[in-house]
Amino acid sequence: MEEVPHDCPGADSAQAGRGASCQGCPNQRLCASGAGATPDTAIEEIKEKMKTVKHKILVLSGKGGVGKSTFSAHLAHGLAEDENTQIALLDIDICGPSIPKIMGLEGEQVHQSGSGWSPVYVEDNLGVMSVGFLLSSPDDAVIWRGPKKNGMIKQFLRDVDWGEVDYLIVDTPPGTSDEHLSVVRYLATAHIDGAVIITTPQEVSLQDVRKEINFCRKVKLPIIGVVENMSGFICPKCKKESQIFPPTTGGAELMCQDLEVPLLGRVPLDPLIGKNCDKGQSFFIDAPDSPATLAYRSIIQRIQEFCNLHQSKEENLISS
């Protein structure tokens, strides 16, 4: 192919030959026809790599700021409490990687081994990978277009040496973007268990979650369920509950009923969650009996039950 624009969407992109940057490119017709696209060998390589990963869970949200990364981190912490369970946490929020901070791993670097990139470990059974580990400073801005993000996700899925893993948790950016399309495409043949969608109770968040649910259905991504985060505040002294974000349209419960998706649970606001995330520590350690911790544990149990059922169905399909 001839010289292409710097901001080319890529011959394999859905926007190939159709995007604004394609105007005037000598390869526009070729890309629009699909003739410029070539089979991506990485899909088979990733499928092979993922054979050592038992369960794969995507964590999604319609909006930023609803606690998606906090949930991903505490899902990983909760599952890793069983020392015999191996957990991998992959942060593909390329432009806003917050997992290194939440997991207490800021300043850590990625190391190369003979079998690929080595994850950074919080515990012996909890490994983490994030683009944040590749930045010289946490304040560095990542200003990448779709093809470069796609390449980074491909490299994470293909080249990170997780070893034998029970749960791979993928923390995604908010919304439905290139990153979501890439990870679903690359893991399509590796059998994703499903997605957990995080929301807050108010309608301004729920309206984007409806779009997220429609996205999952369009790309045939199973929905494990919805978590309503910041669902009320329980006063630690009087135990009275206050609605900080009022569910003016019925909250996640009514939305889940209307769209026929499971509501996994509600996590109340707790100031300790934010404090512990800033310190890079698990909230469960400091507040083992708080309403938020108990809600998390119930949700984690339901996710495990879903994954075990999904695994049984996969095994039955293979045996038949």
Swiss-Prot record:
Its cofactor is [4Fe-4S] cluster. The gene is NUBP1. PANTHER family: CYTOSOLIC FE-S CLUSTER ASSEMBLY FACTOR NUBP1 (PTHR23264:SF35), NUCLEOTIDE-BINDING PROTEIN NBP35 YEAST -RELATED (PTHR23264). Component of the cytosolic iron-sulfur (Fe/S) protein assembly (CIA) machinery. Required for maturation of extramitochondrial Fe-S proteins. The NUBP1-NUBP2 heterotetramer forms a Fe-S scaffold complex, mediating the de novo assembly of an Fe-S cluster and its transfer to target apoproteins. Implicated in the regulation of centrosome duplication. Negatively regulates cilium formation and structure. One of its GO terms (biological process) is cell projection organization. One of its GO terms (cellular component) is nucleus. This is Cytosolic Fe-S cluster assembly factor NUBP1. The keyword S-adenosyl-L-methionine does not apply.
